[in-house]
A protein has these predicted regions:
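Flexible "arm" and connector segments at domain edges
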Residues: 1-118
Length: 118
C-alpha cells in the first residue's frame, strides 16, 4: 500500500461520511477524533502491559482482551485509527501529508545525526 492511495481513499470516505463535505468539521474536531483514537491505543497498551505482568484487569465485555496477541493486535488497530484521523487532520489544514511526513522524519534524523532519510 502506498500512502497516496490511503490518503485518497480516506478523503473520499470522509467526504462521503460527511455528506460530501469533510470540511464541515474544523481542525479541532478532526484533532479531537484523532486524540480519542490515540487514547484508545493507550488503553489497549495498558491492558497489554497488565497481561504481560499477569496483573488482573476488569473490563467491559466488549473491551476484554484475554491474550497478549489480542492486546497487541488491538494496540495496532487503534494506532491505525489514529493514523487515519491524523491524515484527515493534515488534509483539513491543507498540507500535503507526504511532504510534511518526509520533512519531519528527515529533520528528526538530522537533529540526532541518524543517516535514515526518506
Amino acid at each position: 500500500m502506498h500512502l497516496a492511495v490511503l490518503v485518497s481513499a480516506n478523503k473520499s470516505r470522509a467526504n462521503r461520511w460527511h455528506n460530501g463535505n469533510m470540511n464541515e468539521w474544523n481542525a479541532l474536531e478532526w484533532a479531537g477524533a484523532m486524540a480519542g483514537e490515540a487514547g484508545e491505543a493507550c488503553n489497549a497498551a495498558k491492558k497489554l502491559r497488565r497481561l504481560e505482568l499477569s496483573i488482573p484487569s476488569i473490563n467491559l465485555a466488549d473491551r476484554d482482551l484475554r491474550t497478549e496477541h489480542d492486546a497487541r493486535y488491538q494496540v495496532a488497530k487503534e494506532c491505525a485509527d489514529t493514523i487515519i484521523y491524523a491524515l484527515l487532520l493534515i488534509e483539513r489544514v491543507g498540507i500535503d501529508s507526504e511532504c510534511v511526513l518526509r520533512e519531519v522524519f528527515n529533520a528528526k534524523s538530522e537533529e540526532y545525526g541518524f543517516p535514515e532519510r526518506i
